[in-house]
Amino acid sequence: MAPILYMTLLSPPSRAVLITAQALGIELELKNVDLAKGEHRRPEYLQLNPLHTVPTLIDGETIITDSHAINAYLVRKYSSDDKLYPRDHSKRALVDQRLHFDTGILFNSFRNAAAPLFYRKSKEVPQETANQVVEAYRFLEAFLEKNKWTAGGEVTIADFSLAASVTSLDVLVPVDSLLFPKVTAWIQRFQELSYAKVNEPGLNDLKEVVKKCMA
């Protein structure tokens, strides 16, 4: 029986899990959670995930409610090697650091940038918030100074989460290729990965939503 993923395509963390599953060749049973209708706050969903967030993974008796934890779990359980989430302590620590950077900085920046448009009927991202996003891009540029990927020379689940967040942020606060050439090149490398295409439908949906909000 395929693992069940409760998700929504607009969500960067949900798309990060889809990217990981695609990279691993895992078939998931997808269940869309309509946040606009409050489906994430229904009692049956809260029993699975009291935090009422997406994504949530159910694999047999196992329930996991954070995208980074889900991706690490999928690699450990289903991958034939450890390339996407290395067992080496130093390499794994670097991947973990990048994942925490996504949680604390990048995805948090996305939420802060999107909230005024989605929930407060604003037609633009506040300048202070946009400045914080640019600062996040600056951190990422530094991570890529000596490496092809965000946690070293090989692609990892850190890239999947960060790419899902950055490509979404780029819709709200575009990445300046002159200021951030390494981030720009990294996005291009990511998009050339065959399994990265699973990020595109949700990203296109996000572009349409943002376009309507800014109109």
Positions of PLM-derived features:
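Eukaryotic N-terminal low-complexity, Ser/Thr- and Lys/Arg-rich leader segments
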Residues: 1-3, 211-215
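Active-site-flanking alpha-helical
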Residues: 75, 165-166, 200
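Alpha-helix N-cap and coil->helix boundary residues
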Residues: 65, 90, 178-182, 198
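Short, solvent-exposed turn/loop segments enriched in Gly/Ser/Thr/Pro and often Arg
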Residues: 8, 34, 157, 202-206
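GST-like domain detector, emphasizing the conserved glutathione-binding G-site
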Residues: 1-128
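GST-like fold's C-terminal all-alpha helical module
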Residues: 98-192
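Short, hydrophobic secondary-structure boundary micro-motifs
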Residues: 82-87, 108-110, 150-153, 196-202
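Charged/polar, low-hydrophobicity segments characteristic of intrinsically disordered regions
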Residues: 192-210
